[in-house]
Amino acid sequence: MLSMRHSGYTLVELMVTVAVLSIIAGVVVPGARGFINHSILTKEINELSALARLARFKAMEEQTEVVMCPSSDYTHCISNWTYPSMAFYDVDGNGKRGTNETLLSSTEKLHSSVKIKAPSQALVFDARGGANVTTTLTICDDTSKADKAVGLIINGYGKIAIAQDSDDDGINENHAGAALSCS
């Protein structure tokens, strides 16, 4: 008697496979989202850091003021740091980019999933590299959790640093030593 062998999967095998894949997806997908959010925050803070460092360097190199600020038209500074940021020589010291004032560099608009807390005024680096304000630019992801926030610290001497967690509480600190906040 010949036995016929059927190839394929039983309903139970398919259900077990679907259950295992669902469990794996439930573990992997949230982790992937966290990784993506962290990557976006890192990119944004690194771009602002690079722009600030360039602005400070050029101010000292050319012995003139360099302004770093957000702008919607690459001419006028605005207070909304979600717009692209620019750095330019401010030869006449009026805080606006004139036709004879060189645009040194700019960043893209911030990713739509992040928000930023920053000073309402422009950052101005003088010929010695000092800044007009001591501040922290804080960038948060869409969860608004402080332990995910990143910060760019700029002090009056022009020192630029990425915020660190110096007290091991899981939250980076701002220029004053207080925990970064997303609210």
Give the location of each predicted region:
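N-terminal single-pass transmembrane signal-anchor helix
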Residues: 1-33
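N-terminal helix-rich module
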Residues: 2-3, 27-57, 61, 65-183
